[in-house]
Amino acid sequence: YYKTIARINELEPTFEKMTDEQLKAKTEEFQRRLQGGENVFDIQVEAFATVREASKRVLGMRHFDVQLIGGIALHQGRIAEMKTGEGKTLVATLPSYLNALTGRGVHVVTVNDYLASRDAEWMGKIYRFLGLTVGCIQNHMDDRERKEAYACDITYGTNNEFGFDYLRDNMKYDVESLVQRGHYYAIVDEVDSILIDEARTPLIISGPSEEATDKYYIANDIIPKLQRGHKDEETKVTTGDYIVDEKNHSAVLTEQGIAKVEKLLGISNLYDPANMEILHCVEQALKAHTLYKRDHHYVVQDGQVIIVDDFTGRLMHGRRWSDGLHQAIEAKEGVKIERENQTLATITLQNYFRLYEKLAGMTGTAETEAEEFATVYNLDVIVIPTHKPMIRKDYPDVIYRTLEEKWDAVVKEIQEKYEKGQPILVGTVSVENSELISERLKKLGIPHNVLNAKYHAREAEIVAQAGRKGAVTIATNMAGRGTDILLGGNPEFLAREFLKRKEINPDEATPEQYEEALREAKAIVEKEHEEVVALGGLHILGTERHESRRIDNQLRGRAGRQGDPGSSRFIISLEDDLMRIFAGDKLRSMMKWLGMEKGVAIESKTVSKQIERAQKAVEARNFEARKYVLKYDDVMNKQRETIYGLRRRLLFEKDHREYLVGEHGVARDLLHDLTEMYLNPKVPRYNWDVDTYAAEIESIYGVDPAVDAGVDFKTMSPAEIEERIWQKAYANYEEKEKIIGAETLRAYERFIMLNIIDAQWKDHLLSIDHLRQGIGLVGYGQKDPLVEFKKQSFDMFQEMLDRIDINTVKALFNLQVVVRDEQEEIERIERLKRQKARRGAAAYTSAYEGVAAAGEESKKHTPFVRKQPKIKPNDPCFCGSGKKYKKCHGAES
């Protein structure tokens, strides 16, 4: 790394002497060299020197040597761990520019829309100066805007937007409507949050299913009638109707509970396959009542259950728990139960980001999860040194017995810092706790800001000023990530505030007005900066340890940026969730031994180590949970790649004739398989299933073997029969092609195949969901559920591929071509003219539209001879969707 940096630094004087035009011309030079056979590593040193110089001229910011190290690590496809305030946003410009020169597109992934638009605008100035284009994906954009953004050299957006665009692209019916153009290189900002915290939640595009919701009310009424029990770890004896294990986040019925549920439902065996659906509802209702707490895991607003994000405390509008859990909670809360959604497309974030040829990430805290990054994503973590030495003081944890004692101590510490003038940032794990502290501070008359993590842009403004003298800011742990807390405040944000006070819109202010406000702000900030440094910098106060050490480290990392002074402390109690569930018994006995009294805190490194051990245990458990999700999704991933690969081939290749009706096409292979199945040459002719074979052939190919193809089952060999049928079916197909034209038929083929693939894939995903729900039961038969899942899902996938082939051939060979002759068309027009004369112009218009839409009125004198039997309402629909005709195209007609 240091040799490369030395070479970049050597070029700096040369680049400083260049004019703007000469510097901009470097982009075209690099692109020419790449086209001439050089690779990105050959031009890395010069490209980095170019970006550094452009940044100095455009933003007035020069990349430090440690930022160059970060840039090199990212270009190599690694994770750069850089402490808060070390300029991660600027670091990303180096590898983004270099890799964008290939013309294949670079994706910069952020945690929210606000940061995506802020960084695209802010860093975009460098890229635009150097002649590259920059796009930004925002939640509200339509397909046209998204396509334009993806066509840019560098595209900013959130992980969800990138992932959902990928899924939506794989549901499109023509190439022009695709928005993404491939997955070459991605830089993931706050990589730990995106690739680890959110990795257990798959991205799902869903539509309403046809399942009824009353079963959730039935299950919900049963739970209050059950008694909670417990399991004696020594004797293994269980009591009560169900056991709740908070540590493993599970709730299960006991033998006694199963018997009681069976009695309440009036069934003999709850585990009978016929009762699997109600069993699943009872299990989810039990979880809803015992493991999910209102105002902690979710809130009820406007008659809806809205999930609260564990990590940020944000309300996750539009997100729903899957597997019937959301419906169970809706039943518990007595709100309207929304129909369970059926999955149309899904992918985990792990498998989405594995699509990229090269992946890199940045964060302030990745070292604790290095093993997971290596195992799942094959990414190394490189710890980048800080530009200036870290001088923050991290004090040991202070532990109280009860929550009440803890909150008293928290408020007391806030009051002390406020009276001294030292800025303090208080981190909480939930919105509920933020409001609790806020109420107490109001009673004491202490002014403060509360970040309830709902508005990212407003968050940035509050967080930016959290370093001002006497500032008290309460925030959920992760709120306002991506914005630095500058001691004394942020002059740019303060200048905007001054303009607003003068009733001037900051975005419409003249350069003179803005400069004046900025000068005023800088003078105040510089004075306050010195005062805050003298007081010890920003103090971080954590009010509860998070399950993940990384989240605690992120909170601490808000102080002590770029060599600034700062301090941090956690005040916790034995009644906190983490302590109660994971470290309770050992710590309680330790506290007794230490002689802990009411209102007296203890500071002990031994206790802090005990807490860290508890956190490591939780992290290990969560890692296992993510690995478990990934193992199952890996099975699906192979299937998804096959289906999406087939779809893309259909979209991008214009001619599928050979694939469908060629010598070794789908239709010919299917005919061969059917002939082998029913007319096996290895068995005597009298054992052939001729009737079923003839019915299948007529159903799929629209050919009666005996009548249309002249087949004699008594004398012909299977090969001759197959050849006869194929000649007739193929001739019919060619006839249709002559009538409607090759181009029209190719378009129809593509539409039909995509339609059938989507319908079958949707049904397959539903079947897989059901399989996954019940697969755990095979463990009782001493079988590995994962192995069994792989086996059964593979068989189901093969069956689905067979259905796709059969339905495609059936739809194409049974295509009805209706041709209206010239005389008929003349008569139709004459009839319309007579109608016009009788009813007047207005009625004519109406009649014309009606006839044009129906298209059949004009043919009443021509007898219609049906080649195929009439489709009855309950028959499967001809389009291959798998639905009944009356619920599919029958409903439309």
Where are these regions (language model features)?
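Conserved P-loop NTPase motor core
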Residues: 1-573, 577-595, 645
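Generic anion/oxyanion-binding catalytic loop in active/binding sites
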Residues: 12, 399, 632, 750, ...
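Short, P/G- and charge-enriched loop/turn segments at secondary-structure junctions
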Residues: 175, 864-865
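Extended, charged helical/alpha-beta scaffold domains that provide interaction surfaces
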Residues: 298-306, 312-319, 562-563, 570, ...
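Generic detector of short, well-ordered, non-transmembrane alpha-helical segments enriched
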Residues: 369, 422, 470-471, 639, ...
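Short, Lys/Glu-rich amphipathic helical modules
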Residues: 421-434, 652-654, 658, 710-714, ...
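Hydrophobic, well-ordered secondary-structure elements that form the walls
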Residues: 426, 474, 761, 797, ...
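Short Cys/His-rich zinc-binding micro-motifs
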Residues: 867-886, 890
